[in-house]
Amino acid sequence: MNNAANDGYGERYYRVLHAANDLKYFSVKIKESDLAIAVDRKSYSDSLLSLCQRELLGVRRQLEDYIKRHPEFMTSFVPLPLMVGAPEIACRMAAAAEKAGVGPMAAVAGAIAQSLGQALENQVQEVMVENGGDIYLLSKNDRVIAIFAGSSPFTYKIGIRVEPEESPLGICTSSATVGPSISLGRADAAVIKAYPAELADAV
């Protein structure tokens, strides 16, 4: 199920509408992972890009190595027990999957977003990491997250307000009509707020 070519999602066109002037935006991409990252302008430095690249490469390598040992982790639609020596990211995904009653890969985008966000927290005051519609947010200011729902008339007309005391927080979107991810539902956009981000993603 991949309609990215005709829904504007493949190039992440919705990202050009980022409107928080107090944040500095940059992106990191490795293989399937294509992340938009925002930090407060006072904290930004070019070194953050390298930090994010290293963190993304590291978590991907850990997960890929684990999947080589446990291929079912990649394909299962139901929760799975972990093999001995599973990396932290696989453990977090499996825990979220167990709570949601889904396969562990349902939590992968949120888990990666949170991994990068937490890697930045000691370097910045505020951070937002968006990974294919799944967001990890740590903010000291009110934020409104606009909902992208493809060709739906509600696209960009609905937003979710997040107050500082709610963060850190995961805000994750699932869609049956937008993007390459497998969806067993029918909604143009179903949005969940939860912590950690991998739980919001899995649900």
PLM-predicted stretches and their roles:
Residues 1, 40-56, 133-141, 156:
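Short, charge-rich amphipathic segments
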Residues 1-16:
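Short, Gly/Pro- and small/polar-rich lid/capping loops
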Residues 2-4, 45-129, 193-203:
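Alpha/propeptide regions of enzymes that mature by internal proteolysis
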Residues 11, 20-49, 67, 80-81, ...:
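A structural signal for small-residue-enriched, beta-sheet-centric alpha/beta enzyme cores
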Residues 12-15, 41, 54, 60-61, ...:
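Arginine residue identity/basic-tract feature
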Residues 15-20, 126-127:
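Short, solvent-exposed secondary-structure boundary motifs
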Residues 98-178, 183, 193:
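Glycine-rich anion/phosphate-binding loop at the beta-strand->alpha-helix junction
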